[in-house]
Structures are given as C-alpha cells and as structure tokens.
From Swiss-Prot:
Gene Ontology biological process: isoleucine biosynthetic process; L-valine biosynthetic process; taurine catabolic process
Cellular component GO terms, alphabetical: acetolactate synthase complex
PROSITE patterns linked: TPP_ENZYMES
Domain of life: Bacteria
Swiss-Prot/TrEMBL keywords: Acyltransferase, Cytoplasm, Magnesium, Metal-binding, Thiamine pyrophosphate, Transferase
Protein location: Cytoplasm
Descriptive protein name: Sulfoacetaldehyde acetyltransferase
Enzyme Commission identifier(s): 2.3.3.15
Catalysed reaction, written as an equation: acetyl phosphate + sulfite + H(+) = sulfoacetaldehyde + phosphate
Transferase listed as a keyword: yes
Molecular functions per Gene Ontology: acetolactate synthase activity; flavin adenine dinucleotide binding; magnesium ion binding; sulfoacetaldehyde acetyltransferase activity; thiamine pyrophosphate binding
Subunit structure: Homodimer.
C-alpha cells in the first residue's frame, strides 16, 4: 500500500486499529485529545477510570485472559506518573502492554513547564523498553515497534510522545501486524536437550511437574496432563498460578509458594526430577513455607521456558529447554512414547491421593473453627465451594487475600488473576474490571482486604458506568493484617499504623456509587450472601459483599526470610530490644 497523507494522531490510531485494539483505558487529558477525538470513529472505546493505576491493572488482567497486548494512557506529568505501580506490576507479570505517555512539548522541554517531568527515566527500569517518538513522521513506526517488543519480550513497553507531535502532516503506509512483527515463531527447543530430558524423565523414580504461567499462555493444558499421566507425576502449580492445571485431575496436588498446598510441597520434597513447564521458578515462589523446606536441593531440574533470561536464574538446571511450553511438552511426549509404554504407578498415585486428602481435611478444619467475628478462612472456604466453574478469581495481596491461595481450585485456564510478585495492594478489584471486559459472560470475583479496598472502592463508579458487574468480597478485619502479623511476631505486639478503624461499613459507600451490597456478620449467612451476589451480578449490578472477619486469625508472615528481631543500641530505645521480649 502506498503512503498517504495523515496526521500523527491518525497514524497511531491506525496502528491501534490494525493491532485489534478495541479499547484504551486511562483518564483523558489535553495532551492526547487530538488522538482521543478519533477513537469513537475508529471503533476504539475509551474507558475513563477514576485513577490511572486502575487503567494499567485493568489492561494487565485483560491481556492475561485474551492474550492480546493492551493499551493504557495518561496525561503528561501526573497522569503518566500515576501509571508507575501498575506498569511495574505488569512487568513482573510478563504482560504485553503498550503504555502511551504524552510528554511535555518539545519547544518547552527543560523549562520545568506545566506537568513536565522526565517520564522516560521513570519507566526505564519497569518496562521491557522505553521508546521515544523523535519526530512526528515516526509516530506510527514507533508505536508498531512498541507492539513488536511487547509481544516478543512479554512485557510492557512505554512510548513517550511529545504533546506537539500529535499534530502536523505526515506520509504513512498502513501496515498489517504480520508485516512488522513475527507471528507464532516459537519452537519446541533444542533436539539434543529434549533427548537428554527424555532420558532423565524415563529413569526418574519420583518425577514432579511444576506448571507455570507459560502453560496457560501456550494453551498447553492437554499436553501437561498427558505427560503427567505418562509419568504418574504429581503436578504442582507455580506461585499464584493456580489455574495452570485442572484441579479435578487426580494428579493435581495444588500450588506452591506462600499459603500454598502442603500436598504440593511434600510431593516436591520427595522429587528426584522436577519438570518445570513454563515457570521461571521465582525466588519468592519457592521459599520454604509452613517450616517446610520443600524445594529439593539434589533433584535434577528440567526447565522449559520461552525466555532464555529466565533459565536457571534462581535454581541451577540440569537440562535447559528454551521453547514453547506446548510444543516442547508435546515433543517430550513423543520421545517418551518412542521409548516404549510407560505404566501407571499405582502405589505413587495412592500416595498422591493420601496427601491431597490430608491437605483438604486440614484446610477445612481450619476454616470450620468457630469465631465471632467470622473466621476469615470460613469465608474463603464457603465462597470457593460456590464459585461457578467458569468464574474468574482476582486476588489482592495481604493476609486474607493470600490465604485464598489455599482454597480456590480451577478446572480451566485463565481463571486466576493474582497480584503476583510485585505485591501491590489495590490490584484485585481493578484487575477484576479488566477481566470482566475480557470475559463479559463469566462471573468475576475479587478477594480484597479492607486495606486494599480503601485503594479500590472509588472504582465502583467505573464499574457502574461501564456495566462491569464484578463481585468484590471485602474482608473487614479493621487492620493491615499482613503487616500486623509482622509486628506480632517480630515487634512484641507493638502496633504502629496497622489499624483501619473507619468507616464502620463500606456498604453505604458502595450503594451510593450505584452498586448492590450486603454486610455479613455471621458465618451461617456467608453462602446466602454470595448466592445473592451472583444473582445481582446476573442482573448486571456490581456487587460488594463485606465480610466482618476476625483480625486475630492470621497467616504466617510473608517475609520471614527478610525480617529479624530488633536490636537497639541507643539508650532511649533500649527497652524496645528483643532481649526484653517475654520468653515463651
């Protein structure tokens, strides 16, 4: 196609259209209004959120579910800096995202003008790459490059656009994505490494599979299940990726990592071979839990990972396979079959069932311990039982939200969207809005602590405006309980900054925004409240369920590895030293 005359705004909009972008999230601003004016005609909906951080979290979840690189935007200066947290979270989640950042106009750069700051430096360390439009004629080209990098490197790319570069006349050729970025070029990996892996797996006595995010991205559910049954290998899910193996399969042993399943950890503890499929084996996701140092030091590790930067990054590997999770696993299946029939190990299967049943019994008993206020585990247990199979769960970070890792199971992929290792609060509800846009017919349930809810409740207004009927399960324990637990265990119950005494209830605020809401104070009312929430959701209403829970029933500290009892040297602080703590 020949080059045609257009404006930079039109050139960038045409790139978005050809990339299949149906919506952009953000808060409008004068810096990009010339391009914004084009979007309704182009078929791109602008979702106007109440805080730019929501824009990025929505698109993070949207991309994780659809696989499509998503786009968010903010006004230069404060609008763009409000995107920092959500972009950093997406970067650690390996989510392809294009972040459009209008910046100060070139004639005034360096004069500390209105809403001017060095946006490029801010985003350099939290994205895969920072790009700048050097001239209006390059606007379309730079945006195409952003999509190319976002897909290739699996993460956000920041595009800095001086606000005067949206205007003018340029000559641009409108290109299809397959003309400027590779589509589906991943392979199964090196044949020699695949052959080595096959020999190790065939000889393994206690192989264990860790199924990670790459399994979902590559649509490798069937392949992982097949190789697991060939090997009678228990399958553990990597940290906060609980939807990477079907929970109704007999080889499912649950997630690892903080508040994961002991059945998974004991299985890994016995492993002589670990087959990590689509997992980077992150440091936080493999730390000891429940005082179980479960990641085996002497096991042989076969790591299938599409990104060579993640191979052997935390744990030394025996066989590195740089390849697509689906294709590499399929090749291993073929090679194992060529070696002859692999018979199921009935004894091992019985052990797996025993460990699963022990874990299910343990977490149910913990949930059914009576309490007033309600035991928070009881809420998680009841809600997990009632979750529709096609529902999507989004989870925040914090004491209760992290405990959800023990209770929720999934039979389908792309059903668990978690805050992951960036660990910011104020994620679950905002991500839930994006998940609801991605799957309008699926119920979306957000698990949120009352601390995180203070950073989220304003977005009920967005949910109502755009008819996104997300169900927020808000746990009202009157405190930042993850940090409270640290002050209990390491600071002798000296509480500073942990309490959240007001409001008495969040429900009046939710109703004022236009949502439906129920405050639940008795355990026997949990199930009925959640069923009512599902009914309201089916009618198109956003829902807030406020569960009043016991703030003294707490999970272990997140970072036992990074905390220590206090030592104090100055006389005026000596009484705070751990040597004066009561002896247990």
């Amino acid at each position: 196609m020949a080059k045609v005359k257009m404006t930079p705004s039109e050139a960038m909009t045409e790139v978005l259209v050809n990339e299949g972008v149906t919506h952009v999230t953000g808060i409008l601003g004068s810096a990009f209004m010339d391009m914004l004016d084009l979007w309704p005609t182009a078929g791109i909906e602008f979702i106007a959120v109440r805080h730019e951080q929501t824009a990025g979290h929505m698109q993070d979840a949207y991309c994780r579910i659809t696989g499509k690189a998503s786009v968010c935007i903010g006004q230069n200066g404060p609008g763009v800096t409000n995107l920092v947290t959500c972009v950093a979270a997406a970067n650690q989640a390996h989510t392809p995202m294009v972040v459009l950042g209008p910046s100060a106009g070139t004639p005034t750069v360096g004069w500390d003008g209105f809403q001017e700051c060095d946006q490029v430096s801010i985003f350099r360390s939290i994205t895969k790459q920072v790009l700048q439009v050097p001239h209006p004629s390059r606007a379309g080209d730079v945006l195409r490059t952003a999509f190319r990098i976002a897909y290739a490197e699996r993460g956000p790319v920041y595009v800095d656009i001086p606000r005067n570069y949206f205007y003018g006349e340029v000559y641009e050729e409108i290109l299809r994505p397959d003309q400027y970025r590779a589509m589906n070029v991943r392979g199964a990996g090196d044949a020699t490494e695949l052959a080595r892996a096959t020999e190790i797996l065939a000889a393994a006595k206690n192989p264990v599979i860790i199924s990670g995010r790459g399994v979902v991205d590559a649509d490798a559910f069937a392949e992982v299940k097949e190789i697991a049954h060939m090997l009678t290998a228990p399958v553990a899910m990597s940290y906060l990726h609980n939807d990477t193996y079907p929970a109704d399969d007999e080889l499912w042993v649950g997630p690892i990592g903080y508040m994961g399943a002991k059945s998974a950890m004991y299985s890994l503890q016995d492993a002589d071979v670990i087959l990590a499929i689509g997992s980077r084996l992150s440091v936080f996701g493999t730390l000891p839990q429940y005082d179980i140092n479960y990641f085996p030091e002497n096991a042989k590790i076969i790591q299938i990972e599409v990104n060579p930067k993640q191979i052997g990054r935390r744990h030394p590997v025996t066989v590195p396979i740089i390849g697509d999770a689906k294709l590499a696993t399929a090749e291993l299946i073929k090679l194992l079959k060529a070696k002859g029939d692999v018979k199921p190990n009935a004894e091992r299967l019985a052990k797996i069932q025993e460990r699963r049943n022990d874990w299910f019994k343990e977490i149910e008993e913990m949930a059914m311990m009576p309490g007033n206020p309600i035991n928070p585990r009881r809420v998680l247990f009841e809600v997990a039982k009632l979750m529709p199979e096609d529902a999507i769960l989004t989870t925040d970070i914090g004491n209760v939200a992290s405990t959800a890792n023990s209770y929720f199971k999934f039979t389908k992929p792309k059903k668990h969207i978690a805050a992951l290792t960036f660990g910011n609060t104020g994620f679950a509800y905002q991500a839930g809005l994006g998940a609801q846009m991605a799957e309008p017919d699926s119920p979306v349930v957000a698990i949120v602590g009352d601390g995180a809810w203070g950073q989220s409740l304003h977005e009920i207004s967005t949910a109502v405006q755009y008819k996104l009927p997300v169900i927020a399960c808000v746990f009202r324990n009157m405190a930042w309980c993850a940090e409270k637990k640290n002050q209990i265990d390491f600071y002798n119950n000296r509480f500073v900054g942990t309490e959240i005494p007001n409001p008495i209830s969040f429900i009046p605020a939710a109703e004022a925004f236009g949502a439906k809401g129920i405050r639940v104070e008795k355990p026997e009312d949990i199930a009925d409240a959640f069923k009512q929430g599902l009914a309201w959701r089916a009618e198109g209403h956003p829902v807030v369920l406020e569960f009043v829970v016991d703030g003294t029933i707490l999970a272990p500290p997140f970072r036992k590895d990074a905390l220590a009892l206090p030592t104090r040297y100055l006389p005026k602080y000596e009484h705070l030293d751990a040597k004066y703590f009561p002896k247990n």
